[in-house]
Design a protein with these regions (language model features):
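Non-catalytic cap/lid and distal C-terminal segments of serine-dependent acyl enzymes
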Residues: 1-274
Length: 274
């Protein structure tokens, strides 16, 4: 059935990052009829790599997550507020990893290690700002976070470190193999909450040019192994099976095209409890 056209309003904010002193763009996509339904509150989904979320012309790879058409073409998905936090460009690899990379083929170069500070920015600056300025359902159950590649890494970390505040995670093509041992040790020490919902996605043909500078081994297998290990460790830690969804997609590459194609399934999985 043909859906009537509707416009989704977007607002832009500049929030100061405490550890850099610089402002970071944070955009907020409002659900349909947000300004009319003034008594209604909404779940919130936070996205990393905000430049890649809305418009393909802004995306580094020329293709976005297509969140706006996803919402318009899938009216069955619960209405939500979408928050897109821009990455720091050249500082992205440092911010999206809580630990230094153990894998690197670049002599004299070390990446990662600022993920804890970035997580504090997201949870102590961005989330409170959103909850204070928008009609959110600010509780854990209705707070979700999505990221891909290194954005998946930081989603995993924040999802564990702040699991008392985040109820849903969308982890796409995590590059956790870059600091696998450190993440595994960290995860072993955490007491997991059984009702956190986690959507895990990985393709069988993952690997891009950046990956090849960081690892000499079988990168495609590393992506698969890392996602499977995460899934296994969540189960071992007590997360209930009905709260986990793992998808391994044959032939899928490390790119926004398959991520955007699988986003509706991720959002539906979140919304089952909304």
């Amino acid at each position: 059935m043909k859906q009537s056209y509707f416009y989704l309003k977007m607002r832009e904010h500049k929030l100061k990052v405490p550890y850099t002193g610089k402002e970071r763009r944070v955009r907020v996509l409002l659900p349909k009829n947000y300004e009319k339904d003034t008594d209604r509150t909404y779940p919130v989904v936070y996205f990393h790599d905000g430049q890649n979320v809305f418009y393909s012309k802004e995306s580094y790879v020329g293709h976005s997550w297509k969140i706006i058409p996803t919402i318009k073409r899938n009216p069955d998905i619960s209405r939500m507020i979408v928050v897109a936090i821009d990455n720091d460009g050249l500082g992205r690899m440092d911010e999206y990893a809580a630990w230094k990379f153990q894998e690197s083929n670049i002599p004299g170069q070390q990446f990662g290690g600022k993920g804890v500070e970035y997580a504090e920015f997201v949870m102590e600056v961005v989330k409170p700002f959103i909850d204070e300025n928008y009609r959110t359902k600010s509780d854990r159950k209705h707070t979700a976070m999505v990221g891909s590649s290194l954005g998946g890494n930081i989603t995993q970390f924040i999802g564990l470190e702040y699991q008392d505040q985040i109820g849903c995670l969308g982890v796409f093509s995590s590059a956790n193999w870059l600091h696998q041992e450190a993440f595994d040790r960290y995860m072993e020490r955490k007491k997991l909450l059984p009702d956190q919902r986690v959507f895990i996605y990985v393709g069988t043909e993952e690997a891009d040019d950046t990956d090849k500078t960081l690892m000499a081994g079988n990168i495609k297998q590393a992506y698969i192994d890392s996602s499977l290990r995460y899934y296994h460790d969540l189960i071992a830690g007590g997360v209930q099976l009905e709260n986990l969804l793992l998808k391994v997609q044959a032939g899928a590459i490390h790119h926004e095209v398959p991520w955007s194609e699988n986003l509706p399934a991720c959002l539906r999985f979140f919304a089952e409890n909304w």
